[in-house]
Amino acid sequence: GVNYFDTSPAYVQGLSERATGIALKRHPREKFFLATKLSNFSPSTHSREESLAMYHRSFRDLQVDYIDYLLLHGIGMGGMEALRSRYLDNGMLDFLLKEREAGRIRNLGFSYRGDIRIFDYLLSRHGEIKWDFVQIQLNYVDWKHAKEVNTRNTDAEYLYAELVKRNIPAVIMEPLLGGRLSRLNDHLMARLKQRRPQESVASWAFRFAGTFPDVLTVLSGMTYMEHLQDNLRTFSPLVPCTEEEFTLLEDTAQRMLQYPTVPCNDCKYCMPCPYGLDIPAILLHYNRCINEGNVPQNSQDENYREARRAFLIGYDRSVPRLRQANRCSGCGQ
């Protein structure tokens, strides 16, 4: 079954920890592992007072006496200045180390996105801090092509290798690249289905991430019971990818990157929009239409009218009109 639950004060409009605490309260505490984060992204929460309040609120909302895995959330976003303001200058990292020593935090780590210099800096302090784990984005596209997806990212191959050098276990986020690896276009999907016709396309991405021996666990954001059941089939037990399958997935990644999609992982860090746009939904609809061939190059394309109609009908179904891109003011926020 599933026994590792990942949450954050920032998820589900601030309600995720409370909901997680209610859901897990019925189970014996020793039967599950709970991961949450110090998500003090906003400058208004950088102070020691506000950061401490967020930390203690996590315990209250989760209804627990200790946290199994506590993460410095999203280090790398904002560079060294943000890292210093959020965790170093305010003494929060020192505080969390003392909390680990006291047993209220069982394992201390960080999740990484963005500036690679911050990742390298924190690993350079491993001898002093003794990171228990690190959460990285790893999937068969980001393994060698992270910068082709997002120029701010770093190849997972490098991130994972740096953790292995230091014997730091890796927790994997975005194994499906924000769901994109479960929504391949028909041609790419057919190539994987030909090899394993009874298995889902998503299972290939999970098997890829789970094959690496220093992976502690692979996170999965599941919406439906079918997702959970598919994941349980994939991991119980996990069948590691063969070298031939690694080659197939690398070829799939290269072919996928030829499609001009927007590098959106549906993380929702761009939300809320001050003008009410549903930014992730807009980008995901566009990407889906690209993969399905419903975005013509120009008005001279033979199938322009048909593709335009399919795009707009799907757009209205996917995104409420008051939240569509035509309401964007270009505010840059």
Give the location of each predicted region:
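Short Fe-S-cluster ligation motifs
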Residues: E292-C331
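Short, acidic/polar
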Residues: G1, H46-L62, G114-S124, V201-F206
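Beta/alpha (TIM)-barrel catalytic core signal, keyed to glycine-rich beta->alpha loops juxtaposed to Asp/Glu
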Residues: I75-L277, A281-L284, N291-A307
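Acidic (Asp/Glu)-rich catalytic clusters
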Residues: G21-K31, F59-D65, L122-I129, K165
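Residues at the N-termini of beta-strands
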Residues: Y4, Y66-Y69, N107, F133, ...
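N-terminal binding-site loop/beta-alpha segment at the start of enzyme catalytic domains
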Residues: G1-F32, D65, F95-E101
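Structural motif corresponding to the early beta-alpha repeats
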Residues: H27-L52, H73-G76
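Active-site groove signature of glycoside hydrolases
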Residues: F59-L83
